[in-house]
Amino acid sequence: MNIVSVSWGDHISFGEGDGKLDTPEKLRRRLAVWRDELGAGAVHWRMLRSRIPGTYSAAPGYRHPSETAARGQGWDDFEIVPAMAREASLSPWLYVTVWDEGWPLAPEQVRRVSYHNEMHGQHVAWQSDLTRDHPQWLTVDGAGRERQLGVVSLAYPEARHAFVQRWMGLIEPTEFDGLFVCLRSQSRPADTADQFGFNEPARRDFLDRYGIDVTREAFVIDAWRDLLGSYLTALIGELRVALERAGKRLAIGGARGDVVGPPLGNATLPWRDWVRLNLVDRLVINQNSSQCPSMWHQLWPMHRGTGYVQNYLDGTGLPSLAEHVSETYRPVIADSRVKLFVARQWCERSPEAEARLCATPGVAGLVFGSFRHDNPDAVRRNDWRAGRLPRDDQQRR
């Protein structure tokens, strides 16, 4: 069984015909296509950003494409998607993120040289109310001066609670079968892989455990990375309890390997603990934060951090995918109830490679993106400009 990952906002903003997914009828037809052509038995539905309390901002003459996408949708995807997915024999899952809380609009002189992407992400921004109300939760460097915008430190119990409350508020009233928590981030990459994470709760926990203040003294870096990773496990454990009460399942998706990776850092990715403790039902590996899975443009191409012990962008510290699955993931997954899926949204379609992966012991299936499959003409044109307002709209503003 494969999974189809659907970023609804990308479809509405850049899709064509049925691939725009702007009506329930179009969705119904594409669900059957995903089932029959992609072998999908489940759908990960990434909702519109407008469901998360936050603020859009834009330079004069622009509007955020996500803000535009949210306008004029006269149907409730949270009601329609689960029902139609089941009619098509697909299990519906709600797709959410944890390290993708956005950022305020940067000054013009900064945007000239540093931006998410030049086609539709240079002169617009969005930031969650959660990080506007709690800026201290953003991960901070050792000097306490610089923060990674959009990335919340999970060392704060209150921050973890806020995420669990947000997600449960979204999924509990719906008929989605489970929650897919994606660890990808669209935030500006850290300059170095161990730059951030020195928030007060983490500093205090390390001091209590080892007697060392990481902001003033030399410390064992592996122990520090493990501590940072433990907060992610704490979040997943707390979320698991809430989801089980509601009768919902849990899937986690991230990079492959043992660290969170670009653009975030070297914090340990303790997936073995999640499997051992039965905290997740599904694990998706081989994700990529540095490239859009729909349009394939590079995010923050002028920023590529250094110092990663494992880096999926250049292969540092990683074996081949096939070897990694067979030698590392399979032995851990084999004696568990966790299902392992391999993300393919960042790969050219290859029936041979896909068949080999599906035949690899331990692999339950693959994850494909819907956008490129549904919009081949738009993909060929490769024109993803959006956000610039027509002249009449600019004058009215």
Which role fits each region the language model picked out?
Residues 5-7, 91-103, 180-187, 223-267, ...:
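Aromatic-lined carbohydrate-recognition surfaces of secreted/lumenal glycan-active proteins
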Residues 9-22, 59-75, 146-164, 218-231, ...:
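The substrate-binding groove and active-site-proximal loops of carbohydrate-active enzymes
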Residues 31, 49-97, 220-246, 300:
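Aromatic-lined substrate-binding rim segments of carbohydrate-active enzymes
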Residues 38-73, 192-197, 289-309:
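Aromatic-lined carbohydrate-binding/catalytic grooves of carbohydrate-active enzymes
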Residues 54-68, 100-145, 183-215:
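Aromatic- and acidic-residue-enriched segments that line the glycan-binding/catalytic groove
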